[in-house]
Amino acid sequence: MLYLAGSLLFGSGSARAQDPVPLPEKEEVVVDLFARNRTVPAVYVEAVRQQVLSAFADRGRHRIADGEAPGMLAGPPAGWGFVDPATVASVQSEFLQNRMQAMQDAGARYVVTGAIADYKFEHVSLPADSKKPSRPGFRATFQVILSAYDLKLGVPVPDQVYQLRGDAPVAEDADRKALSTLYGQLEYYIDRNFKFETAILQLAPADPRKGVQELYIHSGTYMGVKPGDLFMVYEEIPVGGVITRQKVGKLRVNDVGNSTVAKCKITKGNDEIADAFLAGRGLICVSDSKALFY
């Protein structure tokens, strides 16, 4: 049992925690309006936007604001809303530029927009399965592009392009099947581009032969931390009067028992992390993505 009454139980011989540090604060992400190709029904692009809203909410790392909610910004600029593969990048960039100052003034860290830039529909032969022989069907392919801007740093988030495909005997089912494949990919997008930072609270007792293998970080369910999440560990080092960060190791979350603390296995840099922590040198943990390829 790791947790009791919201507090971490430390075994004897464990390293003493560094000075108390505040919990990470949830920053606000505004999921703004989405555009579409003229061949795409409006209900489809709203379904995509709702998946993005749900993915951010389910990840649990940010405060989420709906750009279409009452009290948010007025509607889009005149003539905005339709894109194609050739124009989507410039249209999205211009849209973000027009909206980001107002979003920043309202306290947002990020603004996210998107578009269904292309839609293709074709007849295909569906493969045979255990119940039915090969038969005619339909294939729907959507090109979805997500664009975002980091308002704090003043830089764009790299665009993410998804090709969503679905096959089904009925045309509308092919559309729905294709669109439904987006949600499962969005956690990787969020983890890659919308990171947060936290601190190491304490080292776990050292193994007599292997040294320090585990530690505790100051983030739990409140920040959406779950087993399997990864963190990179950096040491902050002054260079010529400027604070720089040097990578010293990597963590994988093994156990999350409350809202503020998680136990992690050190997967890289055991000695470096332990030495820096015990010496009181500044260490920062930055959330990382589990995706190897994307």
Regions found by a protein language model. Give the residues of each.
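Bacterial N-terminal signal peptides
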Residues: 1-11
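A structural "domain/chain start" motif
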Residues: 13-79, 163, 196-214, 287-294
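C-terminal/domain-edge helix-coil "capping" segments
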Residues: 18-26, 151-227, 232, 256-294
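Soluble periplasmic/extracytoplasmic beta-strand elements of cell-envelope proteins
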Residues: 28-33, 51, 55, 111-117, ...
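N-terminal segment of the mature soluble domain
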Residues: 31, 39-115, 156-159, 225-229, ...
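Soluble non-cytosolic domains of exported or imported proteins
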Residues: 38-50, 90-93, 139, 143, ...
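Amphipathic beta-strand/beta-sheet edge segments enriched in Tyr/Trp
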Residues: 109-166, 257
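Nucleotide-binding motor/catalytic cores of P-loop/tubulin-like NTPases across gene-expression machines
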Residues: 238-262
